[in-house]
Amino acid sequence: GEYCCDENHANTFVALRTVENAWVRNVSVEHFDCCVTTTSATKYITGQDLSAINPISQITGGRRYAYHINGGQMCLFQRCYSSHHRHEFVLGATTPGPNAFVDGYGEMTFASSEPHHRWSAGCLWDNIVLKGPSASLMAANRGSMGSGHGWAGAQMVFWNCAAPLILVMQPPTAQNFAIGLQATEVDNSKEARSGAKSTFNSIVNTSMIDMKYKD
């Protein structure tokens, strides 16, 4: 369908770089790709009671990362809401952890909340609920997806979360954990089921594992 995709504007509301012991709280943003991102050399950050809605951009790679821990450590995002994003609660490449996303809610979601890119470690998703056409929670072998991501992360924990698709895979020499999760029940619409199947098949094909999606 049609949507607003102009990109001639700022895309990140708050970017924390080389910052320690800081917080962002009680903020609502509209039309930004990203509400808050943390980068390397960033520690002890809290983002809480945040809202990120109606981003204006193309719905494609590199866009719509609502809450993005991209290299930070000891970062906590809690009680955050988003709509119409792709990766709501997401890690960047080789993010060391520990980090956590707690009590988050996303709707009209177009991609996964996950360790993204490659080999991040040590993150908790606790009571994260996602709804939408391609909403999912994943810690997977992303194979040749993107720029050749491969294994996205290790020592990830998904605790009491819900999404139309939840896919947690075990990387070599490490573990990922899925505890108390609900799939499909949170959003059992035809659109969500179709998106879940498409996402699942993409991961299975690129990681070359023998798994089949059961409707």
Indicate where each model-derived feature is located.
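Acidic/polar low-complexity surface segments
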Residues: 1-10, 51-66, 133-145
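Noncatalytic linker/hinge segments flanking ATPase motor cores
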Residues: 66-68, 167
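Catalytic domains of carbohydrate-active enzymes that cleave complex glycans
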Residues: 102-104, 126-215
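Extracellular beta-strand-rich solenoid/capping regions of secreted or surface-exposed proteins
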Residues: 6-19, 38
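Right-handed parallel beta-helix
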Residues: 20-31, 42-57, 71-87, 95-110, ...
